[in-house]
UniProtKB/Swiss-Prot annotation:
Location(s), subcellular: Cytoplasm
Protein name per the record: Ribosomal RNA small subunit methyltransferase H
Function in brief: Specifically methylates the N4 position of cytidine in position 1402 (C1402) of 16S rRNA.
UniProt catalytic activity: cytidine(1402) in 16S rRNA + S-adenosyl-L-methionine = N(4)-methylcytidine(1402) in 16S rRNA + S-adenosyl-L-homocysteine + H(+)
Highest classification ranks of the organism: Bacteria, Pseudomonadati, Pseudomonadota, Gammaproteobacteria, Pseudomonadales
Annotated gene: rsmH
A GO cellular-component term linked to this record: cytoplasm
Superkingdom of origin organism: Bacteria
GO molecular function: rRNA (cytosine-N4-)-methyltransferase activity
Family: Belongs to the methyltransferase superfamily. RsmH family.
Organism: Ectopseudomonas mendocina (strain ymp) (Pseudomonas mendocina)
Binding site for S-adenosyl-L-methionine: 36-38, 56, 82, 104, 111
EC number: 2.1.1.199
Length: 314
């Protein structure tokens, strides 16, 4: 690992922490600690009585978090998915008392830039793609056993790849001769199977995204994490989510919109009083936030980021 794989420019740093409306004595959750960019700014805004709980699946992120926890007693980090933040909040006695939850989705720069993690098609490395290399099935093992139809479905549904069937067929044909173990090898086969290259985008981009999302169950974790965050928040607490592709943002947008609408439309129209259980649970705060020109210039990876903010009503 090189120094470059340890560097990470936090996307929408100031905007996200501002969206949390941090109180000095509040209790906050950073569901995606990463290299601690957001967490450090939250801690800077917290007073002596404030608390911050960080989550991450990545062992290297946990090592960084433990070093920060050793420096600052207000911070604790746990090696769990943010999908499990509800359980952790119950264990720690803070369920329904959390002042804000931040989720910065996707893969961090250190993960992408470290060839040994197997996320990138630009640098050759073991074909892994797991956020936590000690848990679950690697990309190589999944590709070695998955049916052609399943591979095509994953590339189409999670990678939004137009040529999913063609790519899946090429992968299966090639693995019959030799198994895939390296990212460059898979990227080459996927690239050759893509007949319409998009300008400025590697032909393997969407396929790699789809496999990574599937291997890590990212969308399932997101759905669980949003539900858990809502329950963990106190009334008036903020939920801030940064997404990096349309699949994530669609889930976040629909969740917030649904919770902001409530379920009064399921009741008889002539009902004089709407029961509390059918009232909205969230209030949308402002419009979606995107990276500004200065951030886009400093960090091109921020170009696809979109941030949404909501506040708990009940």
């Amino acid at each position: 690992m090189t120094d470059s794989t340890l560097r990470h420019i936090t996307v929408l740093l100031d905007e996200a922490v501002e969206g949390l409306a941090v109180r000095a004595d509040g209790c906050y959750i950073d569901g995606t600690f990463g290299r601690g960019g957001h967490s450090r700014l939250i801690l800077h805004k917290l007073g002596p009585g404030g608390r911050l709980l960080g989550f991450d699946k990545d062992p290297l992120a946990i090592a960084t978090g433990e070093a920060l926890a050793a420096e600052d007693g207000r911070f604790v980090v746990v090696q769990r998915s943010f999908a499990e933040l509800g359980d952790e909040a119950v264990v720690r006695g803070i369920s329904g008392q959390v002042s804000g939850v931040l989720l910065d989705l996707g893969v961090s720069s250190p993960q992408l830039d470290d060839p040994e993690r197997g996320f990138s098609f630009l640098n050759d490395g073991p074909l892994d793609m797991r956020m936590n290399p000690d848990v679950g099935v690697s990309a190589a093992d999944w590709i070695a056993t998955a049916e052609e139809d399943e591979i095509a479905r994953v590339l189409k549904d999670y990678g939004e790849e137009r040529f999913a069937k063609r790519m899946a067929r090429a992968v299966v044909q090639r693995r019959e001769q030799q198994p895939f173990t390296r990212t460059a090898d898979l990227a080459k086969v996927l690239t050759e199977a893509n007949p319409a290259w998009e300008k400025g985008k590697n032909p393997a981009t969407r396929a790699f995204q789809g496999i990574r999302i599937y291997v890590n169950n990212e969308l399932g974790d997101l759905e669980r994490g949003l539900d858990a965050a809502l329950e963990a928040l106190e009334v008036g607490g903020r939920l801030v989510v940064i997404s990096f592709h349309s699949l994530e943002d669609r889930i976040v947008k629909q969740f917030m919109k649904r919770q902001a609408k409530g379920e009064a439309d399921k009741l008889p129209r002539d009902l004089p009083i709407i029961p509390k259980a059918f009232e909205p649970r969230l209030k949308l705060i402002g419009k979606p936030v995107y990276a500004g020109d200065a951030e886009l210039k400093a960090n091109p990876r921020s170009r696809s980021a979109v941030m949404r903010i909501a506040e708990k009503l009940r």
